[in-house]
């Protein structure tokens, strides 16, 4: 099977995105991520396999899903609505196919490159007018490196620029190969925490490979100017003065120039609940501390800094 005919699970394709790279963009969210960030805003994208979303508020109480479920995994609570026994459910999706109220639906859809482009290339005129394009995100796009490479090549034939959104946790050679493609104009590189103990505690993996890959891209003349560092900021976790200053020193060492600060938000809590999980709630930095972090990067380190999603 060629990469052109291959397919991946796509969680969603978000049109008119303005915070996933420059200009107006279409963001493609690929399913599967090796990290398990406790504050993840797309937790339904972590598992590489298909999952079933349950939205009790949409349930009309017809009971049809209960009748057709071959695993007897669905029940109806008079007060809480529809309930799925995740230990019994085998994600056959028979219920989702029959639920026109959309109380049950799959997290993702299997899509080929042509199917992705059929949607993404619809807005080319907006990309051209705003300096936008397509952003490949996740999950973690490196999980599907070969597929992403083929997608980028097909996008190039249509004269559309690509932005890669990555945690940097993956094969360095594969990342560099993607990043060096002429059609890739921007790389959004996540910096969860420079402290490895904190990183392991809150993402489930070491940051050693992430920092090595970041240094590689920052020191490569073909990719260094494409880098945008993205820093999710969680109060008391990765926003301490020690961590912020260590991060800034590392940025100076490798020559990083552009930084996006992303204060924590709790949008992932309901998404996690809808796939049967529970996500801890955190807090963003105070407005005062966020401003100090911004000023540190901007006025002391002379970096190009912006804050996204500021409340």
Language-model features: where?
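Conserved dinucleotide-binding and phosphotransfer motif residues
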Residues: 102, 158, 300
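Auxiliary Fe-S-binding modules of radical SAM enzymes
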Residues: 1-22, 233-311
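Iron-sulfur cluster-binding cysteine motifs and their immediate structural context
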Residues: 38-45, 64-84, 94-110
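Extended, non-globular alpha-helical segments
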Residues: 54-60, 108-123
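Short glycine-enriched, charge-decorated loop/helix-capping segments at active-site entrances
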Residues: 45, 54-56, 200-206, 275-283
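Conserved AdoMet/S-adenosylmethionine-binding subsite of the radical SAM
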Residues: 114-262, 267, 272
């Amino acid at each position: 099977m060629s990469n052109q005919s291959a397919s991946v699970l796509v969680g969603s394709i978000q049109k008119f995105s303005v915070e996933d790279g420059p200009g107006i963009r279409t963001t493609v969210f690929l399913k599967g991520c090796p990290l398990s960030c406790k504050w993840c805003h797309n937790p339904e994208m972590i598992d590489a396999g298909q999952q079933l979303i349950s939205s009790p508020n949409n349930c009309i109480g017809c009971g049809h899903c209960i009748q057709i479920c071959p695993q007897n995994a669905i029940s109806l609570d008079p007060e809480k609505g529809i309930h799925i026994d995740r230990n019994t459910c085998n994600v056959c999706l028979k219920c989702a196919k029959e639920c026109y109220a959309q109380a049950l639906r799959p997290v993702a859809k299997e899509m080929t490159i042509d199917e992705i482009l059929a949607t993404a290339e619809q807005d080319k005129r907006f990309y051209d007018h705003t300096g936008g394009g397509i952003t490949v995100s996740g999950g973690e796009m490196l999980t599907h490196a070969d597929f992403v490479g083929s997608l980028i090549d097909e996008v190039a034939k249509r004269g559309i620029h690509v932005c890669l959104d990555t945690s940097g946790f993956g094969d360095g050679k594969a990342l560099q190969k993607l990043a060096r493609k002429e059609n890739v104009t921007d790389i959004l590189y996540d910096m969860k925490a420079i402290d490895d103990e904190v990183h392991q505690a809150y993402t489930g993996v070491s940051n050693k490979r992430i920092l090595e890959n970041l240094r590689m891209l920052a020191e490569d003349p073909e990719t260094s100017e494409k880098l945008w560092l993205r820093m999710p900021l969680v109060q008391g976790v990765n926003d301490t003065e020690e961590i912020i200053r260590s991060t800034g020193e590392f940025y100076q060492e490798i020559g990083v120039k552009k930084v996006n600060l992303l204060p924590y938000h709790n949008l992932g809590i309901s998404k996690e609940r809808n796939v049967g999980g529970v996500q801890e709630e955190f807090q963003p930095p105070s407005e005062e501390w966020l401003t100090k972090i911004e000023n540190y990067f901007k006025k002391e380190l002379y970096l190009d800094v912006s804050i996204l999603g500021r409340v």
